[in-house]
């Protein structure tokens, strides 16, 4: 399974990551959401390099031009609700993509542990399509793998899956690598953090409170 860490090269992406991490700047809810959207757009552009293309002849006012256009049928899926601004960034670039949504939540127990429950899925046919499974935070990876399995159960198995996250933990990346199809999955992370707390919060991470969800799921 391939991992692409987008901030391994210095680009304008660094500015958006810095702002969503900054505890003062991220209190501006509109900027926070817009930066998630921008990071989604940048990630979508990078993923587009890995898709299948076929030549298409288009007619211009002065003649004809041959352009390589995306051949894959794309489905953009996210876990509600924190993923919505990030999800929109992908739709801005893949504007003819289908949508899929998973509503999942963390159910805590008295001993401090938790299980992840899926309560709602909206998903069409995934067979022979490319699935972009996007979630701002990839912490333990358990909710994302659970979402993937639920989507496949309802819509069938996609021909390829791109997992995208704004911030990913090393533990989450490892979990996804071991529990999703290795030859048919690529992980894209804008940034990777090393530490994951006992409550499954990524450190230094960021806060998703400004898009109606507490700091982290799993």
Task: Give short role names for the model-derived ranges.
Residues 1-213, 218:
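PRPP-associated nucleotide enzymes
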